[in-house]
Structure formats: C-alpha cells, structure tokens
C-alpha cells in the first residue's frame, strides 16, 4: 500500500494553519508557539505553557501517560482544553520528527482533511515546538474539548448498558448507522485511519437520541493515492475487532449495509467483501490477543517483576507493592492470617480466601499454592511450565480475549538454597497464584446440588434451560477464541451475581487445563464438550432435550449445515463413553 501526504484542502476563508494573521507567534525558552490570539493569555505565561500554575490550582488532570506522549485536560474559565505533549524518548522518534515533521503539526493540519468532507473533529488553538539548533524535539498540540462528548468505547461499555432496553436498542441502531456514514465518507475521500478503534471516535447523544460522532488522534490519518476495496476491508477490520466482541451480528450487519449504501461505488461481490472483513478481523484479533497475552511475562505498565531472597514474582500493578514483598518474604503466611478461610487442602494444592490491598482498597482474593507432588517436579519445570504458570498465562489469555475469568493479581515462585537442594536449587519448588475473588458467586456444581432440587418444578425447568444456554454460549466463546479447557466441569464454572436473572453470567476458574491453540483442532472441541457433558449428567431436571438444546446453541446456527449437530452428537457420546470407562478402570470418580 502506498501512502502519501497531500496538501490540506484550501480553507474557504484562505486561512493559513499555524501562521499569521489568525495565529500569533510567541517564544518561551526553546519552545516556540503558534497560538490563536484569543487563547494566548489563557494558555501562555512568561515561561510558556502554564502547566505548573494549573497543577497548583488543581485544574490539571493527566488523562493518558506513556513513553511517547502525555495527554492533559485543563478546566479553564474559557472552557476545558486538552493538551497533547509529544515526547521523543529515543533517537527513532527524534529522527522521525526531523523527516516527517512533528506529530502535533501533522495532527493539526489533518483536521482540514476531515473538515473538508464534513466529518467533525478537533479544532487546534495552539501548537508548541521545542527546537534546538533548528532540530525539532518535543512538541505540543492544544485543542478545546468537544462539549458533552465521550470516547465511543467508554460510552458502549459504561453508559449504554445502564439505559432502558428500548432506548438502548434504538441508540445502538443509530450508532451503527452513524458510524457507517462516517467511515464511508472517510473512505470515499481516500482517507485511512491506521489506528481505527472506538477510543479514537467521540460520541455525543443529541436530544432525539441520535449520535454525533467526531474523530480524533489524526496523526494516524493517511491519504491513499488509490483506495482499493482490499484497503477498505483491512481498515474496517480494525474497527470491527472491538465490536466483534461487544455487539450482535445484526448491529454489525446494519453498520455494513449503511456503509455500502453511502459509498459512491460498490465492491465486486458484497458477500465475499463481508466475509473478508470477518477473516481480516479474526487475523488481526489473534495478533493483538497474542501480544496482550505476553504482558504477564515481564515488567510493563500492567505488571512488575520482583525478586527477594529465594522467591520471585510477577505481580499486577493493581496489587499493593507491600503485599507483594510480604508474599516474597514468606509465601505461606497468607494461610495463617486470622481472616484466611481454607477452601481446599489436598496433596496437589492448598487454597485459601484472604484479604489483600488491591487498587488501594482491601479486597478478598483467592490464594492458591501448587504443592510439589514428586521430587522430580522442579526438574520438570525446566522442560515445561509449572502448573501455576500455566494457570497464570491462561488467565491472561482469557482476559485478553474477553472471556470471563477472575483477574490475575500475582504469580510467585519459590526456589531453594544450594545447601538444601544441590541438584534443583535454582528451579521453582513451590508456586503460588493470587486472583481476585468473584463476589457474589457460587460454583455451578454447588448450585446444581444445593439450590436446583429445592426449586418448584416449573422454575427448575426454566432455570435449567437458562443455564444450558449460558453454558453453550460460554463454550462457544472459548472455542471461537482458540481456547481449550480439558478440565471444564461444573466445579470449575462460577455463576456470577444473582441466579434469578434472565441472562446468567458465568466465569471459568482453575485454568491449569486451559490451552491456546489456533486454529483449535476438532478433537479438542469434542473433548471439551464431552467433559462438560459428563459433568452435567447428574444435574436435577436436565434431559437429553436440554443436551440437544445446548448443542444447537453452541453451534453457530445458520452458518453450519443443519444436520451437523448429529455427527457432533455421536462424537461426544463416544468420547464420553471412553472417558467413563477409563475412570472406572482407574477407580476414579467422575465429577
């Protein structure tokens, strides 16, 4: 793909961006400023941008902070403004700005691209550039806040779910159409946003519930000499990745229909184009998910690797640092705390519920020690990950893929002094896992044994059907996202919140048996289905009709042959029989 930077469309008033007469020049130290006349005094003081003054007055808030840029919000009497401070932490960023101009200047100029095609966007009011011997280094872009607008992802996740169902459905429909119009206009003009996700789209809901959308982060906006349908397809996949996990197929279809209706031309084959978007979305999602899945392996803005004595840990930054150091000093101490509740004591593991400081507040957590079963266990960790690490990594994979599971807080491994174990002293002997406790929650096994039998027959039938649908959706979600759990059973599934709600929310625990395999082989699907089927065999009121209902919900009905369930039914039955006979031969009970 060939990208080119073209001159911005001419302004109707002939106004020059970042130049006189509308813009005034001011020098403060080594930072030169182009600022609109009516904003010069509110923004700039004798020493430049009034950041320290605003910080002292409590007007300054940090919205985003990273190695490459810091975003501030300042509430001024003239109105709220956002300040993007672009940093140059390495030579790569410095050379980039010397060749391609500063990000602040680029983003400011590209506002005209969108203005010319009727897409709302930010309005620059000041540009600051730090130069040393005429070479550009750090730079700033200041823009007023768009009134009553919030990022689209924040709106979809936090605000929209709290609205009444009828209004929520209406706004979702309007959102799909508005987003389709915005994207079609952008592509018709030959523009591609290389970071096209809802966080870079602002939304404001008008009085008639219709949304007004505005695009931000324009440094990622590119002009394509010849925008082909394959280019548009890949760009749509970037946006579709977010909604693929958070919206229904009908919403995505409505968006695509509106997008194609507004476009000035049509793809050669609409069906092939639509399937191509789904394929590109899945490929892009897998790339992102695997990248996010590696976050738990070292130090970054989400996790911190720590070592003290003969123990080391990778802990979430949400867990208080003092808690982590206490665990490194004595990993077994939480089991002896006064508030600790032992949940399980066995040859393979010890599990307790206790309290730790998470995000500055006390929270109940699940603390699990994976015991050493054999003297060879430390040596085996040299060839394969320990059970605690497998569960830790699986939890991160599931969180990255938006599969419900308790939040990972810390992984701890304890070694031995050389004098105690001259052979394996440097390898993990005991490993520990800390996860946030889901509350309120009950395991599906406990609910099936203690609650279901006491319900009236009609209520029990309805509850069994509700649980069946929820289980099928959960397993389909796992498999669609390339995850397999060989030990998926009722005791490893939590029911979150009230069990009387229409849609039951489920969560998966005990993730030692979870594996990431892409693409997921068919035999893995059958094994997971058969394991869950055996675990549900003794649920009161569950019939073979419920098993069929589960299978039909699990299969993407309408996207697979209508008789495909028969072959899968026979394969599950055969795998269940083999599992039952094997456990009987080994003298192990099914659970």
Positions of the model-derived regions?
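Hydrophobic residue at the +6 position relative to the catalytic HRD Asp in the kinase catalytic loop
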Residues: 196, 201-203, 488-495
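Residue-level marker of alpha-helix boundaries and capping positions
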Residues: 101-102, 173, 385-386, 465, ...
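Activation-loop N-terminal segment of eukaryotic-like protein kinases
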Residues: 203-210, 495-503
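Juxta-kinase regulatory segment immediately upstream of eukaryotic protein kinase catalytic domains
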Residues: 2-59, 278-340
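Conserved ATP-binding subdomain of kinase catalytic cores across diverse folds
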Residues: 42-165, 181-189, 193, 279-280, ...
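C-lobe/activation-segment region of protein kinase-like
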Residues: 211-280, 507-574
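Protein kinase-like catalytic core scaffold
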Residues: 81, 120, 141, 209-214, ...
């Amino acid at each position: 793909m060939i990208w080119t930077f073209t001159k911005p469309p001419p302004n109707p008033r002939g106004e020059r961006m970042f130049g006189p007469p509308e813009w005034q020049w001011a020098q403060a130290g080594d930072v030169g400023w182009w600022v609109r006349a009516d904003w010069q005094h509110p923004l700039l003081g004798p020493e430049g941008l009034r950041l320290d003054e605003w910080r002292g007055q409590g007007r300054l808030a940090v919205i985003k902070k990273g190695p490459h840029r810091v975003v501030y919000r300042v509430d001024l009497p003239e109105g709220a403004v956002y300040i993007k401070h672009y940093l140059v932490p390495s030579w790569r960023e410095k050379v980039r700005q010397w060749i391609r101009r500063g990000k602040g200047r680029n983003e400011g100029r590209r506002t005209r691209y969108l203005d010319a095609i009727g897409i709302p966007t930010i309005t620059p009011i000041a540009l600051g550039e730090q130069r040393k011997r005429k070479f550009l280094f750090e730079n700033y872009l200041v823009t007023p806040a768009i009134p009553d607008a919030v990022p689209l992802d924040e709106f979809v996740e936090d605000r929209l779910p709290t609205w009444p169902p009828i209004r929520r459905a209406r706004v979702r429909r309007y959102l799909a159409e508005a987003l389709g119009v915005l994207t079609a206009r952008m592509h018709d003009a030959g523009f591609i946003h290389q970071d096209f996700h809802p966080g870079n789209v602002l939304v404001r809901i008008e009085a008639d519930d219709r949304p007004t959308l505005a695009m931000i982060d324009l440094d990622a906006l590119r002009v394509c000499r010849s925008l082909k349908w394959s280019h548009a397809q890949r760009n749509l996949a970037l946006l579709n990745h977010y909604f693929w996990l958070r919206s229904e197929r009908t919403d995505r279809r409505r968006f695509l229909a509106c997008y194609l209706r507004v476009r000035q031309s049509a793809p050669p084959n609409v069906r092939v184009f639509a399937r191509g978007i789904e394929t590109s979305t899945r490929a892009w999602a897998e790339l992102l998910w695997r990248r996010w899945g590696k976050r738990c392996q070292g130090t970054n803005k989400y996790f911190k690797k720590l070592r003290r004595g003969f123990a080391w840990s990778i802990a979430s930054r949400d867990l208080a640092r003092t808690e982590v150091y206490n665990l490194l000093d004595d990993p077994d101490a939480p089991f002896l705390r006064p508030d600790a509740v032992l949940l399980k004591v066995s040859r393979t593991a010890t599990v307790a519920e206790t309290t730790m400081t998470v995000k500055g507040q006390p929270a109940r957590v699940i603390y699990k020690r994976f015991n050493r079963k054999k003297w060879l266990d430390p040596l085996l960790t040299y060839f394969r990950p320990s059970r605690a690490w497998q569960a830790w990594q699986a939890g991160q994979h599931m969180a990255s893929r938006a599969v419900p599971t308790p939040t990972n807080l810390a992984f701890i491994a304890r070694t031995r002094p050389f004098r105690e174990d001259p052979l394996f002293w440097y390898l993990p002997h005991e490993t520990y896992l800390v996860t946030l406790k889901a509350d309120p929650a009950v395991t599906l096994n406990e609910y099936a044994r203690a609650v279901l039998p006491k319900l009236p027959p009609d209520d029990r039938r309805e509850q069994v059907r509700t649980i069946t649908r929820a289980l099928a959706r959960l397993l389909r979600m796992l498999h669609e996202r390339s995850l397999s759990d060989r030990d998926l059973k009722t005791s490893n599934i939590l029911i979150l919140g009230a069990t009387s709600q229409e849609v039951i929310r489920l969560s998966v625990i005990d993730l030692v048996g979870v594996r990431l395999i892409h693409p997921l082989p068919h035999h893995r699907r059958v094994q997971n289905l058969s394991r869950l089927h055996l675990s549900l065999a003794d649920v009161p009121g569950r019939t073979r009709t419920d098993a069929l209902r589960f299978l039909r919900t699990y299969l993407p009905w309408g996207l697979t042959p209508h008789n495909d369930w028969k072959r899968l039914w026979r394969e599950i039955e055969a795998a269940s029989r083999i599992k039952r006979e094997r456990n009987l031969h080994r003298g192990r009970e099914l659970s």
